[in-house]
Amino acid sequence: MKLLRLFPLELGRLLHSRMTWLIVLLTVISPAVGLVLMYLANPALAGGAAGGILFGLLTVYELDRAGRSRVEVLTNAVVSPLAAALVRLPALLAAAGLALVLTMLVWLPISCGLIGSIFDGGDYVLAYLLFMGLALPLSILAAAAAYQYTRRADLPLVLFAAFAALSLTVWADNWQLCWLNPCVWALSDDFSNFRILRSAAYMRLTWLLGLAGLWALSYLCIRRYGRGPLGSLARTARRVYRPLLAAALLLCCGWSCAAQPFIDHSNPDLSAMTFLTMEPLEGVACLRRSAQVTPDTRRGTVAGTASYQLQNTTGQEQTVALGVTPGYTISNVRANGVEVPFSVSDYQEYNEAKLEVAIPAEEQVELTLEYGGFPQESMPTMQGSKELSGEYLCLENAALSPRLMNVMPGEDGYPATIEITLPVAMTVIPFGASEAEVVAEHGDGTKTWRYETNRAGGILYAGDYVREEIQAGGLTIDFYYGRKHQAVMEAAGAAEAVRAVVDYCAGHYGPLSFGGGERLKLIQSRVTGGGYAVDGASLLDEADFTAHNLGDAGKGGGAAEVMIHELVHQWWGLGNMFDDSGPDSPWSAEGLTCYTTYRIVKELYGGDYAREHYVDQWRGEVEDYYLNFYVRRPEYLEALPEAERLAISNSLSGMRQYSEMPLKILKAEELVGGEAAMDEILHGLFNRELDPMYPYLTYQEFLDACGLTEEDLTLD
């Protein structure tokens, strides 16, 4: 009861301190760092890092107040130092809560304005609570524990600074150790973020247990009766529940860290190919397979049943290997209705573990199994690819159903029937030429979709999508994008941009290798950091269609032209990949993409418009580049700190790719005889026979096709 009476007094004293309000004010404005700093390119992340450091400093400042004023003996005579510690901690936490609430209120209208029509209040609240809100108590606990161990101001500040610096530097790529700045590389605007938010929450709560345990241990070391830390520990620990509580918190932290369900234990050596080079079984073939998949979109888990029709002509028992996504459990494995032994390896590679099943010597074997669980990811720094919610999901290969590793296909390949049951608002999109159809509707608000495919694995997307059917370039294009992004897409003229790009590029360069059929799917994915393609489908990254990207003047004169730019990458960048010529070369997919965008815009809006918004802009930026101080005096660039040097180098490199290279291609166009000649050259490069060992388009290949040298393309 005494503690309850002391708490409002301590909180009132804290809120009457000018230092407290200065820290609160700085915390409220700290998210602005995220608008200008690429390292923490999110206001909530920046606010958490900066606010955490600020409240760590405030904690040491407040705990040292009595010692700094030389009244510690008097205050300890009035209030036990143990009681004072139990009152000061919640008072500091309450001040941190006040700072968080004020920050969220101040940044709510700012975030609404910056994000626009796709602003999601739920994501906003969760992002600030997890990225910023939980950083403040962690910092307070860490700083308070350091002070209670040392009972002086200077050493705790050094320890806390080192602890924060470790999180921001050495531990930055370790999602479980970066306690101050969660390892969050991007949040989706159009789809859900449950997976990455759960991961951040898990990390924060794990650290909360650990730092609470350290604080409880430091609480035992608070100086009493003139004793040192060990003597005080022995005295305070007489009440057994105190050390037991500290030990329990630390043990729970260790267990939580070891039992994390998000990241697998795949071999970090990306050149490892143990599973890929597995010898196929002689005399065993897969005639057909099927899977019935039922994701739980609320829990983010998957449950399914897989069946494989195998032909075993060896007359002997065989061991079939299948790839299983880590996080899944396997059960009820049967061959022709009889349970058979199986095992799952501890070794993992490329987000797969090996399931081995013994099948009988019978010629026709129906292998069935049940699988399910929370699918784990293999890339801790880019979590979110296995998002599974009522708004979006992506199940790839073994995450969709266990993948045969050492069984060859039959005469008809790997014919497969996949069924998946999802909420009615979700549209199922097989990544490929297959088309899904609804085969059943259920009373619980779900539908069952079915599609046929012919692969050992496969990728399936599903979400709250809008589908537009577009006729262009002799193809029927099914353009899928998130419903939340519909207004942005319509304002940017997405359908018209798709039509213009496909008509132009297919007519001038040739059809896409992965669009050789009558239909092509263009699918907007959740933010992934890039795209890829297979026969009949191509992926478009959500990041290409954000309001910020569509307003990038370096890619076009308006949102519609930036949309054209991003779609041209289906030809230059995805249909034809480019080599990395190094930091000193402007050669990349962006050069030909900008040039092609210019040509399309020239056809649509005329030469004067294209010259003003593209060529003149490129020339102006190139002139500024050659006048840049660090370009003229590179020795000064080398003298800068690494972070500053990289920021400047990346900026200059981007200018060369987006402006200098298009001008070089434009000059090459003049030297080879005009637009028609350049179109013929690019058509030949696009349709050249690829070297499977190095399928990249190089700058030298471009120069050779034009009959030019690098010196010929030197800009005046």
Task: Map each language-model feature to its residues.
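Long, hydrophobic alpha-helical segments
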Residues: 43-71, 99, 306, 369
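A surface-exposed beta-strand-loop module
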Residues: 317-319, 327-387, 440-448
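Juxtacatalytic substrate-recognition/specificity segment
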Residues: 348-350, 418, 471-581, 585, ...
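Extended, low-hydrophobicity, Ser/Thr/Pro/Gly-biased non-transmembrane segments
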Residues: 370-462
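Zinc-dependent metallopeptidase catalytic helix centered on the HExxH motif
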Residues: 410-412, 548-627
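Acidic/His/Gly-enriched intrinsically disordered linker/tail segments
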Residues: 590-663, 671, 692
